[in-house]
C-alpha cells in the first residue's frame, strides 16, 4: 500500500488516473536461474525445519513457475518456512534466491549493483519498494505538482 498526501491548495482535489490492472499477474519463472551454487539449503535444514510442520507452506519455484512470487521480506536470510520462497535447484535440490532473482522480483535493472553481503542484500531487498510502482507514482506526483512541466 502506498499513501500519497498533498497539501490543500486552490482548486481543490487532486485527481489521479489509475491505470488498468494487468489481466494476468507477472510470473516468476522467467527470472529463475539454473545451476546456481553457493545458495543451497542443507538437507538437514530442509528435513527438520522447512518441511517438518504442517504449518510450513514454503513456496517452491523453478523456471517453469507461472505464478507471482510471495513478497520478499527483510528476514528472508533466516529461511522462514511460512513466508519463504525457495528455488528447486542447487547442490541439495533447494536453494535461496540469488541477488539477480531478487532484483528482478523488485523491478531493479539487471545492472544495478548491490555492494553488500548476501545477508544485507536480502534485508535491503526485503525492505525495498517495487521500482516500477514508485516510478509511476513519482511521475504522477511530478505531473500534479508541476503542471505543464513548468
Question: What are the functions of these language-model segments?
Answer:
Residues 130:
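A helicase ATPase "motif cassette" and its flanking acidic/Ser/Thr-rich regulatory loops
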Residues 1-78:
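Class I S-adenosyl-L-methionine
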Residues 70-74, 103-107, 139:
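Generic alpha-helical structural context detector
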Residues 134:
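Acidic-aromatic/histidine active-site loop/patch
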Residues 77-116, 121:
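FAD-binding beta-loop-beta segment adjacent to the flavin cofactor pocket
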Residues 12-14, 31-32, 97-103, 143-144:
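Short, surface-exposed, polar/charged, turn-prone segments marking secondary-structure boundaries
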Residues 138-149:
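Short, hydrophobic alpha-helical segments
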Amino acid at each position: 500500500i502506498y499513501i500519497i498526501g498533498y497539501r490543500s491548495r486552490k482548486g481543490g482535489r487532486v485527481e489521479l488516473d489509475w491505470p488498468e490492472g494487468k489481466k494476468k499477474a507477472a510470473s516468476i519463472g522467467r527470472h529463475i536461474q539454473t545451476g546456481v551454487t553457493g545458495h543451497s539449503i542443507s538437507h538437514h535444514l530442509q528435513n527438520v525445519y522447512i518441511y517438518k510442520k504442517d504449518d510450513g507452506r514454503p513456496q517452491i519455484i523453478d523456471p517453469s513457475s507461472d505464478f507471482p512470487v510471495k513478497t520478499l521480506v527483510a528476514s528472508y536470510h533466516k529461511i522462514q518456512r511460512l513466508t519463504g520462497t525457495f528455488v528447486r535447484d542447487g547442490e541439495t535440490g533447494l536453494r535461496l534466491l540469488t541477488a539477480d532473482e531478487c532484483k528482478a522480483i523488485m523491478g531493479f535493472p539487471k545492472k544495478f549493483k548491490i555492494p553488500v553481503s548476501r545477508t544485507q542484500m536480502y534485508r535491503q531487498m526485503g525492505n525495498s519498494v517495487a521500482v516500477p510502482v514508485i516510478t509511476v507514482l513519482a511521475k504522477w506526483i511530478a505531473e500534479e505538482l508541476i503542471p505543464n512541466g513548468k
